[in-house]
Amino acid sequence: MDVHYDADPALIHDKQVAVIGYGSQGHAHALNLHDSGVDVAVGLRPGSSSRPKAEQQGLTVMDIGEAAAWGDVVMLLIPDQHQKDVYEAKIAEHMTPGTALGFGHGFNIHYDRIEPPEAVDVFMVAPKSPGHLVRRTYTDGSGVPCLAAVDQDPSGGAMALAISYADAIGGTHAGVIETTFKDETETDLFGEQAVLCGGSQALIQAGFETLVDAGYPEELAYFECLHELKLIVDLYYEGGLEYMNHSVSDTAEYGGYTRGPRVIDDAVREQMQEILEEVQSGEFADEWIEEYEQGAPQLQEERAALTEHPIEQVGQTLRGMMPWLNGDETSADEDAPDAADTAPASSS
């Protein structure tokens, strides 16, 4: 894969950039672009709670349609499930030859929910971190790795523009990796479902329930199966699998090697393959959009059930004993009817 550490800053500086949305990724992109000297405006719906925040931070704020008409580059950074409706109602009519449409995640392009005119460049810049870290590393003089992809390139310069955009938000300090909309979308969704959100949550709950059902205190089960997971994930994050195993006790390392494969066995791998196939075929995308269009009843049901799970009850009590957990820096995308953040941020 090609990795870029340099860009032509003039490409994005010669454009007017409309960032649609001011949530986790939107605020970071807009502020970083602004501080890099790019002519940027934020497009928000009327009544958005993000309007005063963006204005207080020195940004120009417009209605979404106004911003789309003003921008040479329109960067769509609202949740996946809202993008199609917003694009068709407010943005599509302004996508004229010579303009460019950007995304922070490939969902709506890859699954053909948004189909821009052929004369419009379509690109993606996807930082591989939450928005608050995109912003913090930029202000520290560095950046986070970004993925860049192109779906349409009538100008012949869409990838160069994407890399220039990534440079303006700090991405070239860490590296901008060329990919495709297909690969970014499918790996992102699979990772969320099988490992990061779905798989890890199911594993945590199963471990907690196994200990509690065997008669162990809920508090100990919480510490061993949820709280201490951060210690291990931080080691993965810092140095990979080998570094984690080098950092734990020999007892823990041996137990992990010999028992871990019994948890993630061939049956689990078969389920992972099935999940991947559902992502690749578009089955999951269709299922999720249908769920959303029906008012998300299953999502609401799952949220309510999780709130009542014993691991949440005991966790709330134990976290109250940990005052250092109060400084949460994360922010969800707010410029939408709900606050879901599906622009990994993948999430994700």
Swiss-Prot record:
Residue ranges, compositional bias (Low complexity): 339-348
Q: What keywords are assigned to this protein?
A: Amino-acid biosynthesis, Branched-chain amino acid biosynthesis, Magnesium, Metal-binding, NADP, Oxidoreductase
Q: Does the keyword NADP apply?
A: yes
One GO molecular function term?
NADP binding
- Pfam families listed in its UniProt record: KARI_C, KARI_N
Give binding positions for Mg(2+) 1: D188, E192
The KARI N-terminal Rossmann domain covers 1-179
* Positions with a binding annotation for Mg(2+) 2: D188, E224, E228
The record lists NADP(+) as bound by: Y22, G23, S24, Q25, R45, S48, S50, D80, Q81, H82, Q83, G131
Catalysed transformations (reactions): (2R)-2,3-dihydroxy-3-methylbutanoate + NADP(+) = (2S)-2-acetolactate + NADPH + H(+); (2R,3R)-2,3-dihydroxy-3-methylpentanoate + NADP(+) = (S)-2-ethyl-2-hydroxy-3-oxobutanoate + NADPH + H(+)
Q: Which cofactors, if any, are listed as required?
A: Mg(2+)
- Its domain of life reads Bacteria
Where are the stretches annotated Disordered? 323-348
Q: Tell me yes or no: is Magnesium among this UniProt entry's keywords.
A: yes
Any S-S bridges, and between which cysteines? none
Q: Which Gene3D superfamilies match?
A: 6.10.240.10, NAD(P)-binding Rossmann-like Domain (3.40.50.720)
Q: In which pathway does it act?
A: Amino-acid biosynthesis; L-isoleucine biosynthesis; L-isoleucine from 2-oxobutanoate: step 2/4; Amino-acid biosynthesis; L-valine biosynthesis; L-valine from pyruvate: step 2/4
Q: According to the UniProt record, what class of enzyme is this?
A: oxidoreductase
* Gene Ontology biological process: isoleucine biosynthetic process; L-valine biosynthetic process
| Binding-site list for substrate | S249
How does the cofactor bind to this protein, according to its record?
Binds 2 magnesium ions per subunit.
Cited SUPFAM superfamilies = 6-phosphogluconate dehydrogenase C-terminal domain-like, NAD(P)-binding Rossmann-fold domains
A GO-annotated cellular component: cytosol
Give the family, as the similarity comment puts it. Belongs to the ketol-acid reductoisomerase family.
**Stated role:** Involved in the biosynthesis of branched-chain amino acids (BCAA). Catalyzes an alkyl-migration followed by a ketol-acid reduction of (S)-2-acetolactate (S2AL) to yield (R)-2,3-dihydroxy-isovalerate. In the isomerase reaction, S2AL is rearranged via a Mg-dependent methyl migration to produce 3-hydroxy-3-methyl-2-ketobutyrate (HMKB). In the reductase reaction, this 2-ketoacid undergoes a metal-dependent reduction by NADPH to yield (R)-2,3-dihydroxy-isovalerate.
Its protein name is Ketol-acid reductoisomerase (NADP(+))
Which organism is the protein's source?
Salinibacter ruber (strain DSM 13855 / M31)
